[in-house]
Amino acid sequence: MFLQAIIAGTVLFLIIQYIRERNTLKKIAKHFGGPKPLPLIGNLLEFNKDVPEIFETGIRLLKLHGPDTFFWGLFNRYMLVVSSPKNVEKVLMAKQAQKSLLYTFLESWLRTGLLLSSGEKWFQRRRIITPAFHFKILEQFVAVFNKEADVMVTNLRKHVGGKEFDIYSYVTLMALDSICETSMGTSVNAQNDPDNDYVKNVKSMSVLFLRRIFDPLAGYPVLYELVHPRAYKTRKIVRELHKFTDSVIAERRKQLQESGEEGKRLTKSDENLYSKQKMTFLDLLLNVNVDGMPLDDLEIREEVDTFMFEGHDTTTSGISFTIYELARHQQAQDRIYDEIVAILGKNNREADLTYQVLQEFKYLEMAIKEALRLYPSVPFIGRHLLEDTELDGITLPSGMEVLVSIYMIHRNPEVFPDPERYDPERFSEDAESKRGPYDYIPFSAGARNCIGQRFAMLEMKVALIKLISNYRVLPGESLGKLRVKTDLVIRPHMGVPVTLVERD
Ligand code: HEM
């Protein structure tokens, strides 16, 4: 009898809590507007579609109800999507926030590396890792970008004068080789061995991640891990990915021990840090001290894995969507070619691009920025509020999920008139100075902004200069049909089909 009363009391409590929570949500939903949710399943039916359609539906609903829109998922899972500058600022600058639930799907692979960590751990890691992007180190990385872009250009030569082909896959492999070599000092040789296991596993993780976002069990991690067939597959792939990184770390540690380098621990003020020959990101982690202690292998692995994930799909999309726009806008491509000739001279095809020379490519930078406006590599970023937060005069409860839609922010017609039009002039110095700090944020803003943005810009510039100095890129027949899809990174659904003509 007593037990029955306890059960009945608990059930009643849960029902009351559910109704209360639902009423709060209804109030917020009414305030912001959004698609009408069905009982229990929310708006899940709207998203029960093929992959690019999921993205298109999200954008359609945001346009219809935005700039700030409320979505409801299974049961009481919900999120607010914001793109108005004042709400974006409040969310990105919130002192108390974690990455949203979506990111935890990557945790088995990336653990709590820089992207996923929060609080003190994040703060300490960001401090340690920041020197890896010092310009002295970036200068060395530029040599790697040159080498890998040269391989890409050579591999592309077989398409000159041929039928349309997908250039996205070539860019992906080039970016993967570049991040592997700069972060670990090792080569997976993806460009010449695309069937390499590591390359295949990284790709599979992206697909599994995307499928999980829209899985009905997405919000129930324990159940998902127990019963979902894809959970088993994910665990297997993660084991293999870790095995690879573990072996690279062990090998490098051994090399450093043998050369007597490992004992020479670095501190932030160590001048040698910036003058080291061929310093990789992994070397920095292997040599750094935190409170007098070196990082252990697991701590190093999570950071290296994070870089492998964040550091190649993002630049791949940046480069590929710039190619897409330049193929469609030959005048812009011509201006970049003129810039190449003006800076590097007529014999520019095999020029060795240095950090300093890359700073001179102003129009190219504008062209890349405009492509990142239309196709921001990370189109949404998510936060889990850790304290009640007021937006537009209404209080969002702590625990709420908020998505910042970079994709929609960049299409605000008041800031970017005729927003779908590709026009690099939007990034002239004069035009840029007239915009607010939250009008254009491809690398996010605030303390959690992208640590790799200068690295990314250098890699993108090198790849595009090498490509355009060698070939004129023309649109393939099916280029007009391009559709995009997104997991954490935006991608062309069927690649970027182009044709190539050799330059004189
Ligand atoms: C075009 C290229 C890139 C774009 C558009 C981009 C964009 C972003 C964005 C929007 C974030 C914020 C994510 C969030 O708040 O959830 C971010 C974070 C991050 N990015 Fe990038 N990224 C790019 C390239 C790179 C590269 C090349 C690296 C590494 C070499 C990198 C490493 C990271 C890391 C580690 C974080 C987490 C930083 C932190 O929370 O402290 N990114 N990136």
Regions found by a protein language model. Give the residues of each.
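Cytochrome P450 heme-thiolate "Cys pocket" and heme-binding signature region
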Residues: 131, 310, 392, 429-460, ...
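Cytochrome P450
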Residues: 1-13, 29, 72-80, 136-147, ...
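Central I-helix of cytochrome P450 enzymes
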Residues: 175, 179, 183, 237-245, ...
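Conserved cytochrome P450 catalytic core segment spanning the I/J/K helices
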Residues: 134, 237-318, 349-361, 365, ...
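N-terminal membrane-proximal hinge/A-helix region immediately C-terminal to the signal-anchor transmembrane segment
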Residues: 2-112, 118-124, 139, 143-155, ...
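Cytochrome P450 heme-binding "Cys pocket" and the immediately downstream C-terminal segment
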Residues: 330-332, 440, 453-490
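Conserved cytochrome P450 K-helix E-x-x-R motif and the immediately C-terminal K′/meander segment
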Residues: 44-66, 240-247, 351-392, 413
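Conserved cytochrome P450 K-helix/beta-meander segment immediately N-terminal to the heme-binding cysteine loop
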Residues: 404-432
